[in-house]
């Protein structure tokens, strides 16, 4: 399964680009293992590719192999994990764009809930 999302941002440093890829990979791996036991996963590969030109392109590719007896829709699980990774990366990039800098990966990996106004 592969998805590409185009994100418009000012130019990021090499360290920030690496951080984006690492965050996406960590979110995907954690999501998969939140839904499957490690013993249920025979093989897993998570690849993040980032291309920065006029736009910032993040391509995530995920492969998960489980034994036949594991009753899970692997494609749906991968889709959900990728969607979650894009949400977390988007939040991280918004923080960077607002000038908050690298407030820590842990904050970027928390659930995305904005405080209610009013």
UniProtKB/Swiss-Prot annotation:
Q: Which InterPro entries match?
A: DUF3194 (IPR024502), MTH677-like_sf (IPR035954)
Name the SUPFAM superfamilies on file.
Hypothetical protein MTH677 (SSF110783)
Q: Which domain of life is it from?
A: Archaea
| Acidic residues bias spans | 106-118
Write out the ranges of the annotated region (Disordered).
98-118
Q: Name one Pfam family in it.
A: DUF3194
Instruction: Tell me which family the UniProt entry assigns to this protein.
Output: Belongs to the UPF0440 family.
Its recorded name reads Uncharacterized protein PYRAB15120
List the lineage, top down: Archaea, Methanobacteriati, Methanobacteriota, Thermococci, Thermococcales
């Amino acid at each position: 399964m592969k998805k590409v999302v185009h994100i418009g941002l000012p130019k990021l440093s090499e360290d920030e680009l690496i951080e984006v890829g690492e965050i996406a990979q960590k979110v995907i791996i954690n999501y998969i293992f939140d839904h499957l036991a490690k013993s249920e996963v025979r093989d897993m590969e998570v690849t993040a590719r980032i291309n920065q030109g006029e736009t910032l392109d993040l391509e995530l590719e995920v492969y998960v192999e489980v034994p036949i007896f594991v009753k899970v829709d692997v494609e749906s699980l991968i889709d959900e994990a990728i969607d979650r990774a894009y949400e977390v990366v988007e939040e991280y990039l918004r923080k960077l764009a607002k000038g908050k800098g690298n407030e820590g990966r842990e904050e970027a990996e928390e659930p995305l809930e904005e405080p209610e106004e009013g």
